[in-house]
Amino acid sequence: MAHQITPVIYYFNPNIYPREEYEIRKNESKRHAESLGISWIDDDRFSTGASMPFGYEEAHKAWHCDVTGLENEPERGKRCEVCFYHRLLATARKAQELGIDWFATTLASSRWKSLEQINRAGEAAAQLANSKVPTAHVSFWAQNWRKDGLQERRNALLKEYNFYNQQYCGCEYSLLR
């Protein structure tokens, strides 16, 4: 598209609850990607590499296992960092599988999330993925999507594209708060 970057949207969000909210966000992501002619990958499953892929319910349970014991953590607490890592590791692995050198996340555009946590999780995910498959090196693009007017641009695009803007991060713990 621009700057010789061809984006690919990888949809993997087993943290989102309930399933209806997950479907709304997934369909909105797909609609937007299609309207822009961007490749969109639906990864309703989580694959550990050697094992068979899981469906949404199983992927949500696997995510839930990762955050067990962290249910009472506040927003921006340890639970969020574990959640970011879980999802960004899957993203790093998918990038390796597709031969993509860099990956980023829209999480970094949310004012509700800690940019430092997101960047730590992304770097750790790239490091683990590279240690497992050193011949397919990936790097995390730690871009601050909130500075230099990008937050305002995001808000304008939400309106322009009539894009669904969720009111909570997605997990049941943030929904309850």
Regions found by a protein language model. Give the residues of each.
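Nucleotide-activated chemistry modules centered on ATP-dependent adenylation/adenylyltransferase
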Residues: 1-177
